[in-house]
């Protein structure tokens, strides 16, 4: 594959005529041209055009091993200089072509380089410069592509010398007392001669400038994009050309956007093009460009969503704070739905893009990503509610696909010991480069600890709930009231995310599935691939109807001490009593009367050979309960639901339970001890 290089526009803050005067001494720069001679020189219509053909030798900037194979120390170049002086259209074209007909290697390598100097279209006191180059190696021991990439990489390391050379000779002219060269103007002779030769020769058009004054010069790169290598600059220019004809419906991406997608695909132009095209199509279909002006935050989200923008970090990145541990995930999903939470996330991402541009202007340096601080104080097993995790994975997929490289740093503070479970589930779906930006602070004092968050956020900007002096987002752990939970399906198709193509997680060995959390991630992933869960009760929760006085007992035999039993259920109709029991005996599910318990037999006595480990709690209609319990010993655990005899009608509920392996919790069980008074919080 032919390797291409295209430079951004370099700006010389000198008039075109002065730059050309310095350019005439170009061949005196011995570090670039070893020796040469003029073999042909012609002039057309006076000074309007001058063509100079030159043989020269240029050092072959390649690895030593390649030079040994090629048996060449220098490249013989055929250089063609074309100097146009035509009215106001001043252009110098320089063409380099590798040529050595008596060497067999010349038939296997093709090198072409073209440089252009031209007057700045908007400022006559400045001169523009750009260059292109191609390298094509054929039949080179089967490693042509690798050699081409190596050669182009070596070439780009020398491109910056071009500007230094011209600067050197302009300064040399100044030392000689030449600080001004008369401007070339249209005189009668040149005009008449030009008119006679117009049918034969047409000066090349000036290269068009980028729209919106976004000309990609060195100053623009330093101010808005940051430090880039010449090869990265070239990739950026080439990608821009693929999207330079924007429309009102499909606006041309700015350089910051192009650079983000290039970084996300390791500067592969083809991969970045495909990713960006899909994202632009998605933005058009979902009207993302108008989301900042049209989106209205639901009242429930404004009141109960614990997140918001908060100043900047020490690097100037906009800082967003999310108190995930205080969030009632189930309540929010049931009140506004999964689609609305996705739209909220996209609105936050669009705000982040706007704030990054403002920060760039405010701090006078490139700011092309933002910082996220996530407070996990209060995180418990209730956050592992399966539909909630599924919604989170969908949000991650959408953001990773359409907002790459916007996350500069993620600060995870006050992470409890249950956090590794959630991290195991979601990290599989986060890009590896993004995962490397996560920093974890597990202790309660994450502010003053060694390498604490003071290293990343100014002390006067640290929130008060972390020990700082800045008041922000004071959200106690609170469940949404019944009045706002409308039992909305947590997953729907009104917001189309089909453009987000989910790729399978990295392959794992069979031993990896000893982590139940990883298995959860896989099952959620492939459930999403197959269309997802249309409703949080479908295929996951089981329904139970209980008459007044009737019991339903779920027997769970445990052979894995220190494993964790989790449950989640929702009462749909009438009051229900719930409790958890344990016995060391192994009990089989029997066909006993539904109005009696397995512990009603003569072989069982409470406190002797079985005990109640979760006290009975009354659950009212439309209440949801999540809980967990460490199964410290083997035996049988019993989840029991009962419709009180005093009820005037049958009770209905939906339930789900899961056992998490002890392999994930060794030495980390304290945070999982749950009762209804602490970690097993009710979510309404």
UniProtKB/Swiss-Prot annotation:
PROSITE patterns: CRAL_TRIO, PRELI_MSF1. It holds the Pfam family PRELI. Residues 537-684 form the GOLD domain. InterPro entries: CRAL-TRIO_dom, CRAL-TRIO_dom_sf, CRAL/TRIO_N_dom, CRAL/TRIO_N_dom_sf, GOLD_dom_sf, PRELI/MSF1_dom, SEC14/CRAL-TRIO_domain. GO terms for cellular component: cytoplasm; mitochondrion. It is found in: Mitochondrion. Residues 2-178 form the PRELI/MSF1 domain. The keyword Mitochondrion applies. It comes from Anopheles gambiae (African malaria mosquito). Residues 297-474 form the CRAL-TRIO domain. Keywords: Mitochondrion. This is Protein real-time.
């Amino acid at each position: 594959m032919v390797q291409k290089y295209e430079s951004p526009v370099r700006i010389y803050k000198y008039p075109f005529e002065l730059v050309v005067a310095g350019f005439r001494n170009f061949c005196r720069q011995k570090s670039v041209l070893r020796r040469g001679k003029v073999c042909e020189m012609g002039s057309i219509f006076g000074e309007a055009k001058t063509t100079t053909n030159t043989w020269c030798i240029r050092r072959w900037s390649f690895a030593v091993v390649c030079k040994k194979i090629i048996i060449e120390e220098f490249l013989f170049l055929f250089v063609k200089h074309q100097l146009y002086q035509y009215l106001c259209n001043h252009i110098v074209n320089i063409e380099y072509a590798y040529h050595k007909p008596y060497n067999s290697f010349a038939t296997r390598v093709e090198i072409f380089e073209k440089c252009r100097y031209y007057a700045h279209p908007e400022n006559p006191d400045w001169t523009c410069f750009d260059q292109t180059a191609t390298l094509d190696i054929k039949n080179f021991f089967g490693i042509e592509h690798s050699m081409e990439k190596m050669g182009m990489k070596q070439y780009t390391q020398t491109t910056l010398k071009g500007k230094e050379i011209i600067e050197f000779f302009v300064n040399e002219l100044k030392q000689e007392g030449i600080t001004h060269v008369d401007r070339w103007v249209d005189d009668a002779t040149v005009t008449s001669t030009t008119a006679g030769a117009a049918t034969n020769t047409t000066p090349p058009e000036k290269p068009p400038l980028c729209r919106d004054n976004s000309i990609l010069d060195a100053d623009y790169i330093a101010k808005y994009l940051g430090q880039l290598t010449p090869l990265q600059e070239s990739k950026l220019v080439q990608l821009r050309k693929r999207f330079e004809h924007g429309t009102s419906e499909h606006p041309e991406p700015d350089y910051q956007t192009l650079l983000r997608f290039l970084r996300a695909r390791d500067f592969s132009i083809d991969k970045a093009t495909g990713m960006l095209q899909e994202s632009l199509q998605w933005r058009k279909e979902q009207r993302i460009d108008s989301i900042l002006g049209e989106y209205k935050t639901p009242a429930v989200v404004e009141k109960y969503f614990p997140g918001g923008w908060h100043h900047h970090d020490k690097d100037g990145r906009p800082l967003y704070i999310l108190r995930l541990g205080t969030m009632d995930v189930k309540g929010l999903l049931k009140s506004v739905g999964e689609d609305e939470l996705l739209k909220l996330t996209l609105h936050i991402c669009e705000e982040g893009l706007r704030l990054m541009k403002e920060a760039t202007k405010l701090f006078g340096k490139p700011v092309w990503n933002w910082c996220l601080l996530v407070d996990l104080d209060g995180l418990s097993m209730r956050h592992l509610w399966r539909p909630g995790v599924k919604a989170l994975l969908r949000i991650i997929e959408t953001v990773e696909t359409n907002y790459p490289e916007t996350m500069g740093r993620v600060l995870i503070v006050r992470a409890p010991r249950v956090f590794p479970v959630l991290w195991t589930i979601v990290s599989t779906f986060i890009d590896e480069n993004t995962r490397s930006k996560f920093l974890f602070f597990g202790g309660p004092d994450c502010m003053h600890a060694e390498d604490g968050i003071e290293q990343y956020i100014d002390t006067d900007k640290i929130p008060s709930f972390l020990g700082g002096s800045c008041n922000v987002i004071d959200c106690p752990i609170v469940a949404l009231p019944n009045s706002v939970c409308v039992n909305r399906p947590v997953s729907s198709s009104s917001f189309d995310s089909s453009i987000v193509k989910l790729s399978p997680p990295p392959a794992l060995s069979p031993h990896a599935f000893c982590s139940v959390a990883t298995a959860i991630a896989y099952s959620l992933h492939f459930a999403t691939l197959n269309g997802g869960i249309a409703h949080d009760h479908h295929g996951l929760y089981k329904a139970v109807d209980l008459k007044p006085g009737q019991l339903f007992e779920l027997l769970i035999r445990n052979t894995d001490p220190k494993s964790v039993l989790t449950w989640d259920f929702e009462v749909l109709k009438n009051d229900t009593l719930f409790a958890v029991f344990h016995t060391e005996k192994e009990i089989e599910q029997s066909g006993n009367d539904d109005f009696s318990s397995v512990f009603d037999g003569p072989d069982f006595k409470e406190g002797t050979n079985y005990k109640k480990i979760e006290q009975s709690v009354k659950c009212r209609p439309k209440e949801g309960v999540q809980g967990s319990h460490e199964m410290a010993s083997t035996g049988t655990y019993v989840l029991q639901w009962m419709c009180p005899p005093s009820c005037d009608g049958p009770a209905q509920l939906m339930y789900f339970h899961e056992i998490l392996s002890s392999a994930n919790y060794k030495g980390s069980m304290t945070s999982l001890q749950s009762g209804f008074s602490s970690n097993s919080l009710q979510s309404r």
